[in-house]
């Protein structure tokens, strides 16, 4: 069924297809149809960050930036759903075209630029949702906020989403917001993490619950840089790391149509690079922080490879675009079949 739907959707421009798919998934969720139309994955509960996940395969941020289809995605069988990236104020993102398919490589290039309707709109959609499972909210900074004031934007979003989220992801790794990736390193990272940790303790006291914080990092880091990030996350008391975002690399797609477009590359070509980061993080963290692995999962076995590399959970996005809901089941089954 999804194969036919994909053939039709792929005749449209990528962004039109994305918006239409989101509308359809959202409508199916409101009507309760998605669960009936899609075979559900096997039950594989797991506890991470003090949260109970129905299964370890989640939806990565970026597909549902505004929380438009939370119920719909949950009904497809995802063990958790992450929405966003959301910013304090609405913003249109980068000029179109800004989303490109590379079907020969099972890949996507995007330079969306955190297009979203703002954190207040997203919170309205969360309140309207019936979903009771694990919901992650991914936060970022507005395009026109100077990097040296980025902490302010993250704190605004943290304050607003704190009571609505099961966990909160801090996106410092999108390649499509100028200067954002500099926040992954050195004093910039320390200042951000310290500010987040301090504000989180204040919010935990005010609301009587401690919401886990995860940091999403890029795949384009050396082993030494990755080790420094791991140390900073442990020192600051973060709760998880998501590895990874899209890559600026173009290995294997340079000669393909749209392969030279600017933006972040996701899908199959980032699998090896992303899994390597997971392995390095696992060695540095020594089990002290869980790893949520994203990047390049287009087959069920790729999810198992991420878990074997040291991840506790996985997320999919581009693979879902190409393979549909069946990939959720394949990934859950592959993880369930791993030796204990």
Swiss-Prot record:
The keyword Flavoprotein applies. InterPro entries: Aldolase_TIM (IPR013785), DHO_dehydrogenase (IPR050074), Dihydroorotate_DH_1_2 (IPR012135), Dihydroorotate_DH_2 (IPR005719), Dihydroorotate_DH_cat (IPR005720), Dihydroorotate_DH_CS (IPR001295). One of its GO terms (molecular function) is dihydroorotate dehydrogenase (quinone) activity. It catalyses: (S)-dihydroorotate + a quinone = orotate + a quinol. Binds 1 FMN per subunit. Catalyzes the conversion of dihydroorotate to orotate with quinone as electron acceptor. This is Dihydroorotate dehydrogenase (quinone). It comes from Pseudomonas putida (strain ATCC 47054 / DSM 6125 / CFBP 8728 / NCIMB 11950 / KT2440). The gene is pyrD.
